[in-house]
């Protein structure tokens, strides 16, 4: 009987101890003791808006939130340093779905689950903001951010809908030495549509395509947008040289009417980001500045 009583007490003690440990673990998670490492700038900026601490940040020439100034860098978004990340003992390492295939070997070396979020469009980013809010106990902050973005988007769409004519827009995305043409599937293409512009490129299955200037002239857009991706000053000079030396550009309606605009990486960029409110507003003002 004594043995049975002893074993009963022992089992109860183990159950209570396990329950306490489980409860403690849950409370720890609820209190936000996550060790988060975002691998892209867009994710880093989003986590800042959600008032979340991080233990690692991507290496970037872009200005990151001041609250993260002392956070260790972990390398470029496409090539994070595995050992640098491991040292941080993260619970979550975050990336974006656009580069999911490229990031799989990285997560395999980390021996961790990969968390991927859609930042290809405003709608995709807003869904990701909700997911992050649910995942890291920031539902109120996520709702507030999405409500603000929805409010600005609705305001811009309503104003654009009242315009009698919508400009035809060509979007060039430049990197040092070359450029591509952006479609509606790209983030910048999505913003142009929201702001009331009509993308002259009708490709539906790719974000960016190559195209020669002769074909583009046949489309003859009202407005040309030039967006740099990395080394923005060098890309601006490249575009200026291209438009000056390639004689065909002078025949474009947009060039003749001085409707060629160089966009800044902030608030634009090639992936969705929390500065989308400013980007939508700037595009609308460019498209309809003569109709205010």
From Swiss-Prot:
InterPro entries: ABC_Transporter_SBP (IPR050902), ABC_transptr_haem-bd_IsdE (IPR019957), ABC_transptr_periplasmic_BD (IPR002491). Residues 1-19 form the signal peptide. The keyword Transport applies. Binds 1 heme b (iron(II)-protoporphyrin IX) group per subunit. Residues 35-291 form the Fe/B12 periplasmic-binding domain. It is found in: Cell membrane. GO terms for cellular component: plasma membrane. A lipid is attached at residue 20 (S-diacylglycerol cysteine). Induction: Repressed by fur in the presence of iron. This is High-affinity heme uptake system protein IsdE. It comes from Staphylococcus aureus (strain MRSA252).
């Amino acid at each position: 009987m004594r043995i049975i009583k002893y074993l009963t007490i022992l089992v109860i003690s183990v159950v209570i101890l396990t329950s306490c440990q489980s409860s403690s673990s849950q409370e720890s998670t609820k209190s936000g003791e996550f060790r988060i490492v975002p691998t892209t700038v867009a994710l880093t900026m989003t986590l800042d808006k959600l008032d979340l601490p991080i233990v690692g940040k991507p290496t970037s020439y872009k200005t990151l939130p001041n609250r993260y100034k002392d956070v260790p860098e972990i390398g470029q978004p496409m090539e994070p340093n595995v050992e640098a990340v491991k040292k941080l003992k993260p619970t979550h390492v975050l990336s974006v779905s656009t580069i999911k295939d490229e990031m799989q070997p990285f997560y395999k070396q980390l021996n961790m689950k990969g968390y991927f979020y859609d930042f290809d469009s405003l709608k995709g980013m807003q869904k990701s903001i909700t997911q992050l809010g649910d995942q890291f106990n920031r539902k109120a902050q996520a709702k507030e951010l999405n409500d603000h973005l929805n409010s600005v988007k609705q305001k811009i769409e309503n104003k654009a809908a009242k315009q009698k004519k919508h400009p035809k827009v060509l979007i060039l995305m430049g990197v040092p030495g070359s450029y591509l043409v952006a479609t509606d599937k790209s983030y910048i293409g999505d913003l142009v549509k929201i702001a009331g512009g009509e993308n002259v490129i009708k490709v539906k299955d790719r974000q960016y395509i190559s195209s020669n200037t002769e074909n583009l002239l046949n489309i003859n857009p009202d407005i040309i947008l030039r967006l740099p991706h990395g080394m923005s000053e060098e890309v601006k000079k490249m575009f200026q040289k291209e438009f000056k030396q390639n004689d065909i550009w002078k025949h474009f309606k947009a060039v003749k009417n001085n409707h060629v605009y160089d966009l800044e990486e902030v608030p634009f960029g090639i992936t969705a980001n929390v500065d989308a409110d400013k980007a939508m507003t700037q595009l609308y003002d460019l498209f309809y500045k003569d109709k205010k």
